[in-house]
Amino acid sequence: MKNVNYAKLFDLTGKTAVVTGGVGILGKCFCSGLAEFGANVVVLDIDENAVFEFAKELTTTYGVKAIGITCDTSSPSEVRHAVKLIVKKMGAIHILHNNAQGKTASVNFEDCSLEQWRMTSSVNEEGYFLMAQAVGKQMISQNLGGSIIQTSSIYGIMGADQRIYKNSSSKGKTMGTSAVYSFTKSGVIGLTKYLATYWANNKIRVNTITPGGVEDEQNETFKKQYSNRIPLGRMALKEEMVGALIYLASDASSYVTGQNIIVDGGLDAW
């Protein structure tokens, strides 16, 4: 039997990982997890001060190289500039995590304007397309293969239960899930499957992570109503999404592509 160091399969030392939406609630955890497993990390987000500060924090905490780059992923010129800058400062790109999220305020489907629809789709669809295209081209030119991971949502694979939003709020704002959010997150899964076969000969693997509801200052009413629908009986902690990312980013998943790992406490198993 071949002697395999199974722990080493998860080692990301020497790899460069790019994370969009890098200073968001999940983005920070994803960046930290990648850094802890040895990856050099590029934090991409639209918040200029936050990306630089968080990149410094990653370097101090984990001893890896980390840089912050301000980028609106829905802008073709900004995406091209960001990828060029990453290659200049970091060398090859081995991992892309398409994780930026556009989400408009909750609005009834009947009242949603085209402008509101496009605000979300510009990030969740066009942004994912632009980043995957630009980084995919770079990975092909490097001839080293690579791993692309894209964040979908539980509402990309099932309809939102409107009942759980009754009397619910988060950070003082009324909660709800818009149709465009569900529509775009479903499209992320389709893009993943397409690219997984399209780039298979280039040894670029493409997979999706689909998170369920993550605890983030929602009121107790929402937490209870959401948790009652979950077989495990609670909302997710943001840290619980990281294991799936490390698996998909690393050689531990070297024979996995085109897949969607659902981290939802069993919600879609009912």
What feature does the model see in each segment?
Residues 200, 205, 256-258:
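Short, small/polar-rich loop/turn modules that mediate ligand/substrate recognition or access, typified
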Residues 48-49, 70-82, 114, 239-240:
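The beta1-alpha1 cofactor-binding region of Rossmann-like NAD(H)/NADP(H)-dependent oxidoreductases
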Residues 230-241, 252:
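A conserved structural motif in NAD(P)-dependent oxidoreductases
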